[in-house]
């Protein structure tokens, strides 16, 4: 299959792949740190949450490599956008114990702060890729 259009759009699936894989890695790291901070999550719960949170972005990742890029874009934008909104509120704006500015110093505090910031960055970039993909007007031709 050939695509017409600029090379930046042709690289969109690659950029999306990098972002989704980075997001998955940071989410797992973040959940492991949360488990160490609060001891409320078992390993099985961490695994289940990681799978559920990454299910839609990985579906979008697969679709980015097909002719369904617009759908992939909307899935990325929705899933990572929701994560970005929830994470920004929970870790930076709310008065919860998971606020990076109010968290008591401890062994895992720095890693928690790092993962919270990394999640914001990666999810923000993922939303940008989602917008780009959802607005794509490329025509796919089957040889």
Regions found by a protein language model. Name each.
Residues 29-39, 60-64, 93:
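Membrane-helix exit/interface motif
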Residues 36-47, 88-114:
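Interfacial non-cytosolic loop connecting adjacent transmembrane helices
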Residues 58-76, 81:
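Juxtamembrane helix-break-helix junctions at the cytosolic face
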Residues 102-136:
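Alpha-helical membrane-associated segments of multi-pass integral membrane proteins
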């Amino acid at each position: 299959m050939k695509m017409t259009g600029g090379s930046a759009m042709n690289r969109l699936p690659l950029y999306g792949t990098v972002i989704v894989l980075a997001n998955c890695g940071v989410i797992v790291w973040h959940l492991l740190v949360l488990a160490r901070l609060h001891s409320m999550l078992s390993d099985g719960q961490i695994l289940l949450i990681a799978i559920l949170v990454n299910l839609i972005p990985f579906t979008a990742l697969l679709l980015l490599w097909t002719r369904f890029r617009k759908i992939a874009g909307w899935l990325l934008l929705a899933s990572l956008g929701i994560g970005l909104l929830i994470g920004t509120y929970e870790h930076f704006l709310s008065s919860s114990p998971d606020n990076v500015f109010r968290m008591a110093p401890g062994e895992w505090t720095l890693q928690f702060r790092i993962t919270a910031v990394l999640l914001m960055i990666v999810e923000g970039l993922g939303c940008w890729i989602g917008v780009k993909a959802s607005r794509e007007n490329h025509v796919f031709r089957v040889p």
